[in-house]
Curated annotation (Swiss-Prot):
Annotated NCBIfam families: PRK13662.1
Family: Belongs to the Ntdp family.
Record protein name field: Nucleoside triphosphate/diphosphate phosphatase
Key word Ubl conjugation present: no
Active site (record annotation): R23 (proton donor)
InterPro entries listed in its UniProt record: DUF402 (IPR007295), FomD-like_sf (IPR035930), Ntdp-like (IPR050212), SA1684 (IPR016882)
Organism expressing this protein natively: Streptococcus thermophilus (strain ATCC BAA-491 / LMD-9)
Length: 177
């Protein structure tokens, strides 16, 4: 499949391990694609939940997806600084319809002051049993929590202020065309 280009809009679809559609983001603007990664931006983007509820994102957010890492990163640009929401998830696939991944419940939230919280551990344990996550998936996800925390602690990639600034500036340039 042909990769989307800078300025293109794509749909993002999050699934659960059992194949159910979990959440959809419509019209994410692509800022960069490589063989292994997609960087985009959501800004007042329509989100549809599995139960049909809809909402619109409140602030601009740089989104980062990678084909080798079992997480994706959302850098939310707020008045008090950058906050992050990181989903432990399968590496993405991209087809004609959307960028797609499996959401594995565990999330890491990083507040603007740098505080980190691991979220939804109970939900993960319940779904691990209900949806029969394999021991391999359990191991991979726990290892990728460690990798993610290392990225956070070392300001790697999306956790660097300059990274967010560069991609937000590029978004503003594209938006004003």
């Amino acid at each position: 499949m042909k990769l989307p280009k800078e300025g293109d809009f794509i749909t993002i679809q999050s699934y659960k391990h059992d194949g159910r559609l979990h959440r959809t983001w419509r019209d994410t603007m692509v800022l960069k694609t490589t063989e292994n990664a997609v960087i985009g931006v959501n800004d007042h983007t329509l989100v549809t939940e599995a139960d049909g509820r809809r909402w619109v994102t409140r602030e601009p957010a740089i989104v980062y997806f990678h084909k080798k890492y079992w997480f994706n990163i959302i850098a939310m640009i707020r008045d008090n600084g950058i906050s992050y929401y990181c989903n432990l998830a399968s590496p993405y696939v991209l087809d004609q319809e959307a960028l797609k991944y499996i959401d594995y419940d565990l999330d890491v939230k990083v507040f603007a002051d740098g505080e980190k919280k691991l979220l939804d551990v109970d939900e993960y344990e319940i779904h691990k049993k209900e949806m029969h996550y394999s021991p391999d998936i359990d191991y991979i996800l726990k290892e990728h929590v460690k990798i993610l925390v290392d990225w956070i602690n070392n300001g790697k990639g999306p956790f660097s202020q300059s990274y967010v600034n560069i991609w937000y500036k590029r978004y503003l340039e594209l938006r004003s065309r």
